[in-house]
Amino acid sequence: MKILVDENMPYARELFSRLGEVKAVPGRPIPVEELNHADALMVRSVTKVNESLLSGTPINFVGTATAGTDHVDEAWLKQAGIGFSAAPGCNAIAVVEYVFSALLMLAERDGFSLRDRTIGIVGVGNVGSRLQTRLEALGIRTLLCDPPRAARGDEGDFRTLDELVQEADVLTFHTPLYKDGPYKTLHLADETLIRRLKPGVILINACRGPVVDNAALLARLNAGQPLSVVLDVWEGEPDLNVALLEAVDIGTSHIAGYTLEGKARGTTQVFEAYSAFIGREQRVALETLLPAPEFDRITLHGPLDQPTLKRLAHLVYDVRRDDAPLRKVAGIPGEFDKLRKNYLERREWSSLYVMCDDETAAALLCKLGFNAVHHPAH
């Protein structure tokens, strides 16, 4: 049995070699000749999986080590009898911590407390719900917008997007990309919505580029009305609007979900799915794969305030480290993908063990995802 894996999928060779012969290949584009001699294909979001890629090949299973699946024609795979698995929620924590890193940076720069802000979360799935939990642990007011969940009668106080535009100081988008249908998210933030944003609002897009109308956003920024913008995703990736990048506060190369833990979760989830598909079910403990982090233990004296949280969060991951490299190479063909391929190792907050002499600080850090313990001072 031969399994093709994206060369940038961590731990893929190590895991899938337990099931068969593994060949690592580039994800964009996948070499067609390899597909003609393989049984399974494991991809990331850069690979478009559809009839034109797989028709006539012996591939009988596709796994994507990503939460999003808009790069996969699931209907065609089903019709063709090809097994499929994604990795829902694999990088949700990474995206939440990206949003926090950006918000804590902007709060320090502009001198505001997050507790004084109302944060509107658009899309309350794996990412949005975790973001809500962590924000509320800090006592921050959140407003939720998720029309499909509201229509299903899911538990939660769901608002309309209009209400979020009127009331929220931060709008952060965490939806899938739906190009049509009743819950279309293509240009969910369209020209009308962007024009209506209050001065000083923070707009964050870390889901899919086309959820926000990039041309309309640039027009608003060029009009000189104050708006803080954080973009990890862009229309037309890997090509992006360089003028828009120059106008935003933070711009990164679709890496919000790129923690080592998130990537490893993605690989292990599709590995477990494929092992079950071929009747050789296996489970993988994530901690057995991960190396020791750069920083792994620290002592915190006293209570946890916003500046201290920012320093702890940025000790693990400061979003600015990914903003500067993109600005340096923006507009040069191939560089966007290169930044993603050669991405510096990044860990999640759970990799940092924090000893606190303040019991309340330890409890709060645990709720925020840090590995914290109360250690009374002697």
Curated annotation (Swiss-Prot):
<dbReference type="InterPro" id="IPR024531">
    <property type="entry name" value="Erythronate-4-P_DHase_dimer"/>
</dbReference>
<feature type="binding site">
    <location>
        <position position="257"/>
    </location>
    <ligand>
        <name>NAD(+)</name>
    </ligand>
</feature>
<comment type="similarity">
    <text>Belongs to the D-isomer specific 2-hydroxyacid dehydrogenase family. PdxB subfamily.</text>
</comment>
<dbReference type="GO" id="GO:0051287">
    <property type="term" value="F:NAD binding"/>
</dbReference>
<dbReference type="InterPro" id="IPR029753">
    <property type="entry name" value="D-isomer_DH_CS"/>
</dbReference>
<dbReference type="InterPro" id="IPR029752">
    <property type="entry name" value="D-isomer_DH_CS1"/>
</dbReference>
<keyword id="KW-0560">Oxidoreductase</keyword>
<dbReference type="Pfam" id="PF00389">
    <property type="entry name" value="2-Hacid_dh"/>
</dbReference>
<feature type="binding site">
    <location>
        <position position="146"/>
    </location>
    <ligand>
        <name>NAD(+)</name>
    </ligand>
</feature>
<keyword id="KW-0963">Cytoplasm</keyword>
<dbReference type="GO" id="GO:0008615">
    <property type="term" value="P:pyridoxine biosynthetic process"/>
</dbReference>
<feature type="active site">
    <location>
        <position position="208"/>
    </location>
</feature>
<dbReference type="GO" id="GO:0036001">
    <property type="term" value="P:'de novo' pyridoxal 5'-phosphate biosynthetic process"/>
</dbReference>
<dbReference type="GO" id="GO:0033711">
    <property type="term" value="F:4-phosphoerythronate dehydrogenase activity"/>
</dbReference>
<dbReference type="InterPro" id="IPR006139">
    <property type="entry name" value="D-isomer_2_OHA_DH_cat_dom"/>
</dbReference>
<dbReference type="InterPro" id="IPR006140">
    <property type="entry name" value="D-isomer_DH_NAD-bd"/>
</dbReference>
<feature type="active site">
    <location>
        <position position="237"/>
    </location>
</feature>
<protein>
    <recommendedName>
        <fullName>Erythronate-4-phosphate dehydrogenase</fullName>
        <ecNumber>1.1.1.290</ecNumber>
    </recommendedName>
</protein>
<dbReference type="GO" id="GO:0046983">
    <property type="term" value="F:protein dimerization activity"/>
</dbReference>
<feature type="binding site">
    <location>
        <position position="45"/>
    </location>
    <ligand>
        <name>substrate</name>
    </ligand>
</feature>
<comment type="pathway">
    <text>Cofactor biosynthesis; pyridoxine 5'-phosphate biosynthesis; pyridoxine 5'-phosphate from D-erythrose 4-phosphate: step 2/5.</text>
</comment>
<keyword id="KW-0664">Pyridoxine biosynthesis</keyword>
<feature type="binding site">
    <location>
        <position position="232"/>
    </location>
    <ligand>
        <name>NAD(+)</name>
    </ligand>
</feature>
<dbReference type="InterPro" id="IPR020921">
    <property type="entry name" value="Erythronate-4-P_DHase"/>
</dbReference>
<dbReference type="InterPro" id="IPR036291">
    <property type="entry name" value="NAD(P)-bd_dom_sf"/>
</dbReference>
<feature type="binding site">
    <location>
        <position position="66"/>
    </location>
    <ligand>
        <name>substrate</name>
    </ligand>
</feature>
<keyword id="KW-0520">NAD</keyword>
<feature type="active site" description="Proton donor">
    <location>
        <position position="254"/>
    </location>
</feature>
<dbReference type="Pfam" id="PF02826">
    <property type="entry name" value="2-Hacid_dh_C"/>
</dbReference>
<feature type="binding site">
    <location>
        <position position="175"/>
    </location>
    <ligand>
        <name>NAD(+)</name>
    </ligand>
</feature>
<dbReference type="Pfam" id="PF11890">
    <property type="entry name" value="DUF3410"/>
</dbReference>
<comment type="function">
    <text>Catalyzes the oxidation of erythronate-4-phosphate to 3-hydroxy-2-oxo-4-phosphonooxybutanoate.</text>
</comment>
<dbReference type="GO" id="GO:0005829">
    <property type="term" value="C:cytosol"/>
</dbReference>
<dbReference type="InterPro" id="IPR038251">
    <property type="entry name" value="PdxB_dimer_sf"/>
</dbReference>
<comment type="subunit">
    <text>Homodimer.</text>
</comment>
<feature type="binding site">
    <location>
        <position position="258"/>
    </location>
    <ligand>
        <name>substrate</name>
    </ligand>
</feature>
